[in-house]
Every structure is written in structure tokens, then in C-alpha cells.
């Protein structure tokens, strides 16, 4: 997606219009192009810590090096997913929203101890190449919102960055949640993490149990309309569930999402606050990232407070940029299942 539009997608200091517009631009590319590995075109990985190592990513790019990478620098969401799958000491650096203004870890960091990692960039457009070089990286890992566009790697310096180490990139929009999770499991395994370790298998069991609970909740309490949305001071954004891996997965389990009728760029419909009630719903699944306004921030907006689902207290946090691991997704599914189970029809 063009950088003129993309920076706002992730930068905390700008409006949510730009934040989501970047995603919309990404959606067009994702929906128009089938890229890289999928269920019918699986990744390949080979090698050990001492011999030749290779891995094929979602660009259908095969990385081949002399030994297993043991110094990995990754986008924060990618690093968090790899950590959940057992990659630990090999992670030496991260980029993307890692720390909040308070100095605490951003929720995107998951189980990572961010104080033990070198942060080469914390905001959109920030990537310290000199600091990256001092890490002596063997591999860079990130996502792609659009085919062949590396998430949080500035295009202005991408060539220099990629000269320092090979890269692996995974598609993170317009794909199924299980397949996106599996890609990170494949890479973690290729990096030497045991995918049969109890921490991994237990997380998978929890994910499966949570998924079953969500299906049971939608069956037991049918007809609950869920509005997946994000908010800023000027607009309310209604998400198209079909391009979000987590939302489309939840839909397959029976969640009834409100479908916006005027989707811009493939990701969302933006509404003025005066029209925030355009789509009646029973539950709001609200973007919980640091860049988005939260219920406490929205309390002073009459149009927000007037929504029936808000009056009923039926607002659930949504980490709209999923962490592609079983451990990262299971708690979100559990929370949504519980919310739907207890929700009441208000529209």
C-alpha cells in the first residue's frame, strides 16, 4: 500500500481515518492477489542448526542460508507469535509498536519480555538501520497487509535493510486464521522450536476448546448481531469481517457480524459520529489497540452513549491486529464466546 496512505494505519499520533485507510488500501491488494503459501501451496522448510537451512514464505520466496538463523529481528506481532511457539533466545530485536508512552509493553508484545530485546523502531516509519546492523541479524520476519509489502519496514530504506539479512514475510489479511497461525508454527519449527512441546500443544487444545465454546455460544444464543468497529475523535469505523483472519474465523463458528454496506478499499466503512447508529447491533467488538479510542475515551460522545448495545454494557475489546498463535488467539475467542453467551438482544 502506498506510504502516503499507510503511515497513518499504525501511527498513534494520527487519526483513525488514515489508520484504517491504510488497511483499506491493503485489502484491495490482498483480495485481488493470491500470494505465497496457502493450504494448496504449503511452505517448505529444511535444515538444522549446523547444516543448510531453507524456508519458503508467502511471497514464494525461498530463503536459503548455511545454518539455522539464530539471530532473528521481527515485527513485534511476528516476534510475539514466534515466542508463543517456542522461539526464545533466537529473538534479538523487534520493530513496530513495542512500548507504550508509559514504558510498559504494548499489548501487541504478548508474552515477550521487551526489556530484553533491542527495539529498532517503535512507531511507523521508524527503523534504525545502524542499530539493526549491530544486532548482526540472520533473518528478518514480518507480516504483509498487501502482497510483497513488508509491514513496518519503511520502503524508503527497505533496500538497505534487506541487504543486511534475508527476510520472511507472511500474509496477514484476506487469509484464514488457522492457516495464518500454522505459518508461524512452521517457521518456529524451522527455527528449532519443538512444536510438540506441552506449551504449544496445550495452547492448541485451549484454542480448540475456545473455538468449540464460541460455536456453542452462537448456537445457544442465536441472533446476536456483533458490530466489529474502531473509533477516533471524528469517525466510527465498521469493519468488513471477511478480510480480517480472526473475524472471518469467528463467522465460520456462527458469529453474526454486521456487514457494512459501503466498504472503502475492502476493509471498513467510515461513519460520522452523527451516523454511528446506522447499523443496529447487540454487541460492539471494539478495537482495543493503543491507537484506537476506548470506551472511557468515548464516554463523552452522546452518539456513542446512545447506542443500545453501549447502554446495555455489551462492549467487548477486540485486538484487531491478531497475534497469529494459538496462545495469542485463544483468550480472545474465550472472551467473545462469554460475551455472546450472556448478551441480550437490544436491537
Segments the model singles out, each with a brief description of its role:
Residues 159-232, 322, 326-347:
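Extracytoplasmic substrate-binding proteins
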Residues 43-88, 97-100, 340-347:
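Extracytoplasmic low-complexity, Pro/Thr/Ser/Ala/Gly-rich segments
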Residues 98-103, 146-156, 169-187, 223-247, ...:
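Extracytoplasmic ligand-binding site segments that recognize negatively charged/polar headgroups
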Residues 35-45:
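Bacterial lipoprotein signal-peptidase II cleavage site
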Amino acid at each position: 500500500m502506498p506510504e502516503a496512505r499507510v503511515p497513518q494505519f499504525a501511527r498513534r499520533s494520527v487519526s483513525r481515518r488514515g489508520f484504517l485507510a491504510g488497511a483499506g488500501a491493503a485489502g484491495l491488494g490482498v483480495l485481488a492477489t493470491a500470494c505465497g503459501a496457502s493450504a494448496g501451496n504449503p511452505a517448505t522448510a529444511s535444515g538444522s542448526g549446523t547444516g543448510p537451512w531453507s524456508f519458503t514464505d508467502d511471497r514464494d520466496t525461498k530463503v536459503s542460508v548455511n545454518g539455522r538463523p539464530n539471530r532473528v529481528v521481527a515485527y513485534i506481532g511476528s516476534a510475539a507469535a514466534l515466542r508463543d511457539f517456542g522461539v526464545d533466545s533466537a529473538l534479538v530485536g523487534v520493530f513496530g509498536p513495542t512500548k507504550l508512552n508509559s514504558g510498559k509493553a504494548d499489548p501487541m508484545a504478548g508474552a515477550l519480555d521487551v526489556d530484553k530485546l533491542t527495539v529498532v523502531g517503535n512507531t511507523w516509519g521508524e527503523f534504525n538501520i545502524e542499530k539493526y546492523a549491530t544486532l548482526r541479524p540472520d533473518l528478518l520476519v514480518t507480516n504483509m497487509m498487501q502482497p510483497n509489502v513488508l509491514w513496518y519496514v519503511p520502503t524508503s530504506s527497505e533496500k538497505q535493510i534487506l541487504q543486511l539479512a534475508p527476510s520472511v514475510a507472511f500474509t496477514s489479511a484476506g487469509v484464514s486464521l488457522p492457516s495464518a497461525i500454522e505459518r508461524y508454527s512452521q517457521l518456529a519449527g524451522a527455527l528449532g522450536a519443538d512444536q510438540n512441546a506441552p506449551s504449544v500443544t496445550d495452547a492448541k487444545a485451549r484454542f480448540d476448546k475456545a473455538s468449540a465454546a464460541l460455536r456453542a455460544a452462537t448456537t445457544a444464543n442465536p441472533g446476536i448481531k456483533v458490530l466489529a468497529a474502531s473509533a477516533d475523535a471524528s469517525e466510527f469505523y465498521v469493519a468488513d469481517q471477511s478480510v480480517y483472519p480472526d473475524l472471518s474465523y469467528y463467522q465460520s463458528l456462527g458469529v453474526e457480524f454486521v456487514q457494512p454496506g459501503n466498504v472503502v478499499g475492502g476493509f471498513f466503512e467510515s461513519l460520522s459520529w452523527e451516523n454511528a447508529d446506522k447499523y443496529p447491533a447487540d454487541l460492539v467488538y471494539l478495537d482495543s489497540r493503543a491507537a484506537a479510542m476506548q470506551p472511557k475515551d468515548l464516554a463523552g460522545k452522546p452518539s456513542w452513549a446512545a447506542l443500545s448495545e453501549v447502554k446495555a454494557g455489551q462492549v467487548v475489546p477486540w485486538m484487531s491486529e491478531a497475534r497469529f498463535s494459538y496462545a495469542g488467539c485463544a483468550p480472545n475467542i474465550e472472551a467473545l464466546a462469554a460475551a455472546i453467551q450472556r448478551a441480550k438482544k437490544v436491537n
